UniProtKB/Swiss-Prot annotation:
GO terms for biological process: leucyl-tRNA aminoacylation. ATP binds at residue 617. It comes from the Bacteria. The gene is leuS. PROSITE patterns: AA_TRNA_LIGASE_I. Pfam families: Anticodon_1, tRNA-synt_1, tRNA-synt_1_2, tRNA-synt_1g. InterPro entries: aa-tRNA-synth_I_CS, aa-tRNA-synth_Ia, Leu-tRNA-ligase, Leu_tRNA-synth_edit, M/V/L/I-tRNA-synth_anticd-bd, Methionyl/Leucyl_tRNA_Synth, Rossmann-like_a/b/a_fold, tRNAsynth_Ia_anticodon-bd. The lineage of its organism: Bacteria, Pseudomonadati, Pseudomonadota, Alphaproteobacteria, Rhodospirillales. This is Leucine--tRNA ligase. Its main location: cytoplasm. It is found in: Cytoplasm. Its EC number is 6.1.1.4. Belongs to the class-I aminoacyl-tRNA synthetase family. Keywords: Aminoacyl-tRNA synthetase, ATP-binding, Cytoplasm, Ligase, Nucleotide-binding, Protein biosynthesis. It comes from Rhodospirillum centenum (strain ATCC 51521 / SW). A motif ('KMSKS' region) lies at residues 614-618.
Length: 865
């Protein structure tokens, strides 16, 4: 037997696939297409185990679909703009572009060693001008269509990165990347009008049946449609009417205060003459901006001294507070508080000694006795203490209150969304320049299309915080395209989520220098049939990509409803953490198990083993994929990633697991190279018939082909590996019997040898999606020329996957007495004889005359005595 040389084998087949251009594809209307895409990586320097798992999943699907006859598009690119490159410039003194392109080269090489079936001819990097020139053109078209605009607004400011964050990039009040507490600032920003499509984005979620429910729910909650009423309070002291939005107009008679956001225009007006209020507003703007944090934080308010008149009762006034829990970004930035029926309002009212008046009483309770203590009542009930609403249910009362408001001309029923327009301005260098010029005479002027792309200057410095473009001595100074006068370029760059909002479209036509993409190629390839990535992108990238697709359709670029037909969110790769006696984190390679305890390898000192968590550079619980590939090979890494856990759950990395994968690869190799008997030559015609032993081998193979195919289709990769192992074990057992016969001088019958070859060939084909290098080497070892990946998935003989035996129930006078196994084609006499021969049946009929036996083929035998 030749020893399986993993390094030589994997390098050989990777070169063979590259030389043959095996994974390069073109649109072919004669073939069904399949577009599989994993979320493209940020080129941070080296791939990690999360990449290995993610891209292995996509590759298994791509290779399987190709084997099933699909024209498969499986591309790769780089989400290459972003702050880490600027941070590297600060820390290492290297230009962001140089750092990025070097990382791309490193990571491309690493991914190629994984043996991925990727069409590298379609590779894109979003930091290249040939990519982002189209992005700039798209933005200008959005501007013309009214889908992009500029306004002054309160923004989330990351004080560490010195840049603006979208609401979606604020996690628990902190910047999604730096973890710094986010502040509120007012800046002129560019926005994309995602709210224009809010209804469609929400309603279309129902049709995304191949998306995880949790992702659809997250997007639904983020869009946050609320049906209610907008109306205004008349204000004291000559202040303008105050508009509020509420989903509970039925509780207006329970109102005890009005609250406005610290960023509301009225708050600014009042603070101008009130230093204490100004200080309170400043304090609010220094604290967390996330809704989750605001919901749980202490409720604080500042009594302004201004009052608001109740819309239904002239002369009834409510005190107006500036409150830290009212968001300017939601509704109108003003609310009325009904403490009895809203927990947040109740907490606020208790703190500031405001009235708590129940107006919704649970069915069957005495209104005079019902009271609210520490918990607001938010359930159904009947209106009380509410004048014309008394006696109505909650929904009826809402409708009646809205009618009264509309009749009085003080507001109207309406629908509001939690979703806000997407602020896309970022104060950083390494991003796509926004193609606008600011002229003191002409205002904001789009850069003429002929001048695109607006590229970044190379001569920048990072020796001070903030945006180098704003400090550049020459780049930003240009002539106005309209009047020719002195003007300045926009120095903000795009939020990098813009690049990832359309890259999947560019892959359909990546070398088009004129258009972002040919609509006909998009029509052929899109939507992405299977998208794979982390659930953490549910309300960032995935929502933005859905919006961008709609905006492009609105502007005539394409005719596509949704970008991703199927979505799969994979689990993380995890590992235990290790700390030395000094509290410092240790890499797994620095520790070992010795005499019943984990110790440091170098000095034997004790190691504290921590929880199994997501692999993290900061805690050093990482394993370098490159070292694993060099030691065990890509196929072993791929197999382990598919083996031990359902793909949507976390996978714990273990040395035992990768060792087991390597041992299995060698078992498969021995099965092909040492069957223990002679196989017929490749292409030998099938025998006219097959005996029992040959049929058993064939049945194993054909069942495995069917079941493994179904498992891959259903993303049950761990099950497909288990079935593969079961199949190979069955083949090994069958071969052992045939080898024993051969050793005894009796060669296997022709039908048995033919079935053995068929099983090995089918095994190689089934191995290929998961362990492609090994599979190709097995194919050659079996005497075949050419590439295995060009062969179809094994055709399944339906007769071989039908069980040849069935379990039949035996009843005596209608009572179940036994079950028996019969041949599927057993006749009535055979079934009757088997039933009456069963000991339990014989005991039940003993001494009783037999009247008749009724046989329902393959289901039941009923004995009547």
């Amino acid at each position: 037997m030749s020893r399986y040389n993993v390094r030589e084998t994997e390098a050989k087949w990777q070169a063979a696939w590259a030389d043959a251009g095996s994974f390069a594809v073109t649109a072919d209307p004669a073939k069904p297409k399949y577009y599989v895409l994993e979320m493209f990586p940020y080129p941070s320097g080296r791939i990690h185990m999360g990449h290995v798992r993610n891209y292995t999943m996509g590759d298994v699907v791509a290779r399987f679909k190709r084997a099933k006859g699909f024209n498969v598009l499986h591309p790769m690119g780089w989400d290459a703009f972003g702050l880490p490159a600027e941070n590297a410039a600060l820390e290492k003194g290297v230009h962001p572009g140089k750092w990025t392109y070097e990382n791309i080269a490193t990571m491309r090489g690493q991914l190629q060693t994984m043996g991925l079936a990727i069409d590298w001819s379609r590779e894109v990097a979003t930091c290249r001008p040939e990519y982002y020139r189209h992005e700039q053109k798209i933005f200008l078209d959005f501007l013309k269509a009214g889908l992009a605009y500029r306004k002054e607004s309160w923004v989330n400011w990351d004080p560490v990165d010195n840049t603006v964050l979208a609401n979606e990039q604020v996690v628990d009040g902190r910047g999604w990347r730096t973890g710094a507490l986010v502040e509120k600032r007012k800046l002129s920003q560019w926005f994309l009008k995602i709210t224009h499509f809010a209804d469609d984005l929400l309603e279309a979620l129902k049709g995304l049946e191949r998306w995880p429910d949790k992702v659809r729910t997250m997007q639904e909650n983020w869009i946050g449609r609320s049906t209610g009423c907008r109306f205004f309070f008349r204000m004291s002291d000559g202040h303008p009417d105050l508009e509020v939005f509420t989903t509970r107009p039925d509780t207006l008679y329970g109102a005890s205060f009005v609250a406005i956001s610290p960023n509301h225009p009225l708050a600014a007006t009042l603070a101008a003459g009130n230093p204490a209020l100004a200080d309170f507003i400043a304090e609010c703007n220094r604290t967390s901006t996330s809704e989750a944090d605001i919901e749980t934080a202490e409720k604080k308010g500042f009594a302004t001294g201004v009052t608001a008149e109740h819309p239904f009762v002239p002369g009834w006034t409510l005190p107006v507070y500036v409150a830290n829990f009212v968001l300017m970004e939601y509704g109108t930035g003003a609310i009325f508080g009904c403490p009895a029926h809203d927990q947040r309002d109740l907490d606020f009212a208790r703190k500031y000694g405001l009235p708590v008046k129940p107006v919704v009483i649970p069915e069957g309770q005495d209104p005079a006795a019902f009271a609210v203590a520490d918990e607001a009542y938010t359930g159904p009930g009947v209106l009380r203490n509410s004048d014309f609403l008394d006696g109505l249910g909650v929904e009826e009362a809402k409708a009646a209150a809205i009618r009264r408001i509309e009749e009085a001309g003080r507001g109207q029923g309406t629908t509001m969304y939690r979703l806000r327009d997407w602020g896309v301005s970022r104060q950083r260098y390494w991003g796509c320049p926004i193609p606008v010029i600011h002229c003191p005479k002409c205002g904001a002027v789009p850069v003429p299309e002929a001048q695109l792309p607006v590229t970044l200057p190379d001569d920048v410095t990072f020796d001070a915080p903030g945006n180098p473009l704003a400090r550049h001595p020459t780049w930003k100074h240009v002539a106005c395209p309209c009047c020719g006068g002195a003007a300045e370029r926009e120095t903000d760059t795009f939020d990098t989520f813009i690049e990832s909002s359309w890259y999947f479209l560019r892959f359909a036509d990546p070398r088009n220098g004129t258009l972002a993409f040919d609509p006909e190629l998009v029509k052929y390839w899109l939507p992405v049939d299977q998208y794979i990535g982390g659930v953490e992108h549910a309300v960032l990238h995935l929502l933005y990509a859905r919006f961008w697709t709609r905006a492009l359709a609105h502007c005539g670029y394409l005719d596509l409803a949704e970008p991703f037909a199927g979505l799969f969110t994979q689990g993380m790769v995890t590992h235990a953490t290790y700390q030395g006696t000094d509290g410092k984190w240790l890499f797994p390679a620095e520790v070992e198990f010795r005499e019943g305890a984990m110790v440091k390898s170098d000095d034997g000192t004790a190691v504290t083993v921590g929880p199994i968590i997501k692999m993290s550079k900061s805690k050093k619980n990482v394993v370098d994929p490159q070292q694993i590939i060099e030691s065990y090979g890509a196929d072993a890494a791929r197999l382990f990633m598919m083996s031990d856990s359902p793909p949507d759950r976390d996978l714990e990395w273990t040395t035992a697991g990768i060792d087991g994968a390597w041992r299995y690869i060698n078992r498969l190799w021995r099965l092909v190279t040492e069957p223990g008997f002679d196989l017929p030559a490749p292409g030998t015609p099938a025998p006219a018939s097959f005996g029992e032993e040959a049929t058993a081998i064939r049945r194993l193979a054909h069942k495995a082909a069917q079941q493994i195919g179904e498992d891959i289709e259903g993303f049950r990769f761990n099950s497909s590996v288990a079935r593969l192992r079961s199949f190979s074990n069955g083949v090994q057992d069958a071969f052992a019997k045939l080898a024993a016969k051969a050793a005894a001088g009796t060669a296997p019958a022709a039908d048995e040898a033919w079935a053995a070859r068929e099983a090995l060939e089918m095994l190689a084909r089934m191995v290929e999606p998961m362990m492609p290098h090994l599979a190709h080497e097995m194919w050659v070892e079996l005497g075949h020329a050419g590439l295995l990946l060009d062969r179809p998935w094994p055709a399944v003989d339906a007769a071989l996957v039908v069980e040849d035996t069935v379990t039949v129930a035996v009843q005596v006078n209608g009572k179940l007495r036994a079950t028996i196994n019969l041949r599927r084609d057993a006749g009535n006499e055979e079934a009757q004889a088997a039933a009456l021969a069963d000991p339990a049946v014989q005991k039940a009929v003993e001494g009783k005359p037999l009247r008749k036996v009724v046989v329902v083929p393959n289901r039941i035998v009923n004995v009547v005595v």
